[in-house]
From Swiss-Prot:
Lineage of producing organism: Bacteria, Bacillati, Cyanobacteriota, Cyanophyceae, Gomontiellales
Gene Ontology MF terms in the entry: manganese ion binding; phosphoglycerate mutase activity
Pathway connected to this protein: Carbohydrate degradation; glycolysis; pyruvate from D-glyceraldehyde 3-phosphate: step 3/5
Physiological role: Catalyzes the interconversion of 2-phosphoglycerate and 3-phosphoglycerate.
HAMAP family: GpmI
Active-site residues, record numbering mapped to chain: 65
Quaternary assembly: Monomer.
Cofactor: Mn(2+)
Residues reported to bind Mn(2+) 2: 15, 65, 439-440
Annotated residues for binding of substrate: 126, 156-157, 188, 194, 258-261, 331
Protein name: 2,3-bisphosphoglycerate-independent phosphoglycerate mutase
């Protein structure tokens, strides 16, 4: 019979809570966070890397929530889709991709239009401009002449007004190829909603599927006009600037590689049972997505999912132990789908709690978001005493940090700090262990070198704090522990397994962050009282 460990391990992911020593523009340094400050002083802590090759991204590439949670749950460095697709573009195999070739040849034979849809930036979080340029090169080489680009502008994973640079680079490439045109523009606020705010998605969809209300203005000028009215890239209202509506018989390639913000717009095009808003299904329509956005969607996939076996959740489930995932809407997919390596359905013994995010235009209007409700759900679950592992995400540092609003971000951080304090008391009373970390940086850098708002992620490391409960929580140590200072997110799953006394599978190549000190064994510390 498998015995459930006496007390839980609770992994707290402070989304976007990075570490940076510089004080200028550092919302975390400016915020009053007595709980996190006390824990950092009182308990074993270290910094872990969350960007670049440490998480399977190109060198110097900032991390993101999808990548972070994927590495956290997999317990290994997972080669990311950005690298996978970029390699295909560089070595020429992209042009031979069966799913892409089929849609390209199809529109060529039918004499219909090819539509390239996606986020037009080099942010590398949801897409990369180089991938779009490679798709255009492929169209040129295959003799596809009717090419319509539906450019989604960023301003969130890039600077707020950097879109003009990306659009100009795209237009220059089209001019060199003497083929294709930009036909629509839409800020990601509309085209890439992930919180079922269908009114936003509908505005992008209507513009993409209708040749009415054409604004005869170059794309760069549309953006410049928006900047003059304080409308940044993210919030650019959808607009059609040239003919080329998506119609029956056409082919579509959605070149975003991250699923969560591409899913809803894709559903509007391909789901025969779509209920988000009134529309007639465009059929037939050859629709290809770069990666699998949702297993239930009937569309071709250029880069099918990679198989990850023996991830952390599977190891827990295989031992007959119960686990829980809790997050509000904005990060729910991350603690479930991404943390489970792309598995949509819950694992055996895995429970999930979704707390609705507040329905506001931008989260600086509600910086506390739903953190208090998330905390209460976790406390209630921990006190049941049935879960061996609990994974909880606090979205505030990232989601409010993305607004670029310093005051609101400070308020968000302080709200999360209070919640961590409340959760801490509950976990320690149960004799549990609290592991506090983040998936990437954001809130620690709110301005760029010129003092302008910085709304993107960072390449900074993030904190990792190990908070012990009343009992002997680190098996085999019975004393203070030291933590390695060269770790990455992939090392956290092995750390959890060590605490739970579970063997680490061979596929999990990360290394536990725990290393015992060379001292005589003594009883565990009395937990330090945290200033609340």
């Amino acid at each position: 019979m498998v015995l459930t460990p006496v007390s839980p391990v609770v992994l707290v992911i402070l989304d976007g809570w990075g570490y940076r020593e510089e004080l200028v523009g550092n919302a975390i340094a400016a915020a009053h966070t007595p709980v996190m400050d006390s824990l950092w002083q009182a308990y074993p802590h270290t910094l872990v890397y969350t960007s670049g090759k440490a998480v399977g991204l190109p060198k110097g590439q900032m991390g993101n929530s999808e990548v972070g949670h994927l590495n956290l749950g997999a317990g290994r460095i997972v080669p990311q889709e950005l690298v996978r697709i970029s390699d295909a573009a560089e070595d020429g195999s992209l042009a031979a991709n069966p799913a892409l070739v089929q849609v390209y040849e199809g529109v060529k034979q039918r004499g219909t239009k090819l539509h390239l849809v996606g986020l037009c930036s080099d942010g590398g979080v949801h897409s990369h401009l180089d991938h779009l340029l490679a798709l255009l090169d492929m169209a040129k080489s295959l003799g596809v002449t009717q090419v319509c680009v539906h450019a989604i502008t960023d301003g969130r994973d890039t600077l707020p007004t950097e879109g003009k640079t990306f659009i100009q680079r795209l237009q220059d490439h089209l001019d060199r190829l003497e083929m294709g045109q930009i036909v629509t523009l839409s800020g990601r606020y509309y085209a890439m909603d992930r919180d079922r705010r269908w009114d936003r998605v509908e505005r992008a969809y209507r513009v993409m599927t209708s040749d009415e209300n054409i604004v005869d203005t170059p794309a760069w000028k549309i953006l410049a006009n928006g900047y003059a009215e304080n409308i940044t890239d993210e919030f650019l209202p959808p607009v059609r600037i040239a003919p080329g509506a998506i119609a029956a018989g056409d082919g579509v390639v959605f070149f975003n590689f991250r699923p969560d913000r591409a899913r809803q717009l894709t559903q509007a095009f391909v789901d025969p049972n779509f209920k988000g808003f009134e529309r007639s299904l465009i059929s037939p329509l050859d629709f290809v997505t770069f990666t699998q956005y949702d297993a239930s969607l009937s569309c071709a996939i250029a880069f099918p999912p990679q198989n990850l076996s023996n991830i952390l959740g599977e190891v827990i489930a295989a031992k007959g132990l119960k686990q829980l995932r809790v997050a509000e809407t904005e990060k729910y997919a991350h603690v479930t789908y991404f943390f489970n390596g792309g598995i949509e359905d819950p694992l055996p013994g895995e429970d999930r709690i979704l707390v609705p995010s507040p329905m506001v235009a931008t989260y600086d209007q509600a910086p506390a978001m739903s953190a208090a409700q998330v905390t209460q759900e976790v406390i209630a679950a921990v006190e049941k005493g049935v879960y061996s592992m609990v994974v909880v995400n606090y979205a505030n540092p990232d989601m409010v940090g993305h607004t670029g609003q310093m005051k609101a971000t400070i308020q968000a951080l302080e709200a999360v700090d209070r919640c961590v304090g409340q959760l801490l008391q509950s976990v320690l009373q149960m004799g549990g262990t609290l592991l506090i970390t983040a998936d990437h940086g954001n809130a620690e850098c709110m301005v760029d070198e010129q003092g302008n708002p910085w709304t993107a992620h960072t390449t900074n490391p993030v904190p990792f704090i190990l908070v012990e409960g009343e009992g002997v929580k680190i098996p085999g140590h019975g004393t203070d522990v030291a933590l390695r200072d060269d770790g990455c997110l992939a090392d956290i799953a092995p750390t959890i397994l060590e605490i739970l006394r579970l063997p680490q599978p061979a596929e999990m190549t990360g290394r536990s962050l725990i290393q015992p000190l060379e001292v005589d064994l003594r009883p565990n510390r009395t937990p330090v009282r945290v200033r609340l």
